[in-house]
Amino acid sequence: MDDKKAGAGVSAEKQKALAAALSQIEKQFGKGSIMRLGDGEVEKDIQVVSTGSLGLDIALGVGGLPRGRVVEIYGPESSGKTTLTLQVVAEMQKLGGTCAFIDAEHALDVNYASKLGVNVGDLLISQPDTGEQALEITDALVRSGSIDLIIIDSVAALVPKAEIEGEMGDSLPGLQARLMSQALRKLTGTIKRTNCLVIFINQIRMKIGVMFGSPETTTGGNALKFYASVRLDIRRIGSIKKGDDVIGNETKVKVVKNKVSPPFREAFFDILYGQGISRQGEIIDLGVDAKIVEKSGAWYSYNGEKIGQGKDNAREYLRENPDIAAEIENKVRAALGVVAMNPTAAAVAATVED
């Protein structure tokens, strides 16, 4: 009995000491700087923004890209990296979010962006001279708490000031990696607090002398690999033809890293030139997989009614009948256990209230 009383006394003292420590931390660093998971103040539901691709939203496991996180999208040239990020911008703008595009490559095509559904009049754009300037602008925008999405295009173009001011042949090893590491250390906490989604577009390089495993690596050192909650590897795997003309690319995206859901899932979709990701094409493919759309030979049918011979005609039918496309999409989402359309309405509303 005495041992139990002594144990209870020690436990009460520990609780008292813990309460005093928590009180001191909150006094010094502000309310919410430390909390119990069971108190319900920590968000369990992850707020997301759609990628514009139904298949990729499903592969991500939470219905889109998570807000308040860092995301990296990388792949070879002309694989669809900028197209995918511009689609995310369009989706965020549909929900009333404010977006910024840090164009370090100085290569943003405004006409193409508007064709993808981006409201270019409301898009904030910066074309910085140095990597430091680009990341300082990003930091200032994130800290403002009024930006929902920031795109940095691309990490490879974030050239340190010392390199720009130096001579062509100067050897400056590790400068860019140090710049990225410092910036991400500074940014991550603020990104989480302000619920801003920051997407880094990255390029691929080849490591020399690799005998085993993949020789591919991304630029800017290893920091981004660690800090990113989601990493997407995007590749062009084929061409889409209409007669003899190539009208788009068949694209594969692999979720290489995912801190919010199981990783290593893949999504396949079409990117049509001048139109972006073919939503209707995805609805057809996923509808066939889920047995919601029937395929017999070259014909596609829905509810016993033929909607087109060949994928191109079926895609055109769904473009002309958006109600049927939305109906099939919601059935596909229900079959795969993904939230019905507009998964980020609540997320944007929360930002507006803040």
UniProtKB/Swiss-Prot annotation:
Pfam families: RecA, RecA_C. It is found in: Cytoplasm. It comes from the Bacteria. One of its GO terms (cellular component) is cytosol. GO terms for molecular function: ATP binding; ATP hydrolysis activity; ATP-dependent DNA damage sensor activity; damaged DNA binding; single-stranded DNA binding. Its main location: cytoplasm. The keyword Mitochondrion does not apply. One of its GO terms (biological process) is DNA recombination. ATP binds at residues 75-82. Disulfide bonds: none annotated. Belongs to the RecA family. Can catalyze the hydrolysis of ATP in the presence of single-stranded DNA, the ATP-dependent uptake of single-stranded DNA by duplex DNA, and the ATP-dependent hybridization of homologous single-stranded DNAs. It interacts with LexA causing its activation and leading to its autocatalytic cleavage. This is Protein RecA. The lineage of its organism: Bacteria, Pseudomonadati, Pseudomonadota, Betaproteobacteria, Burkholderiales.
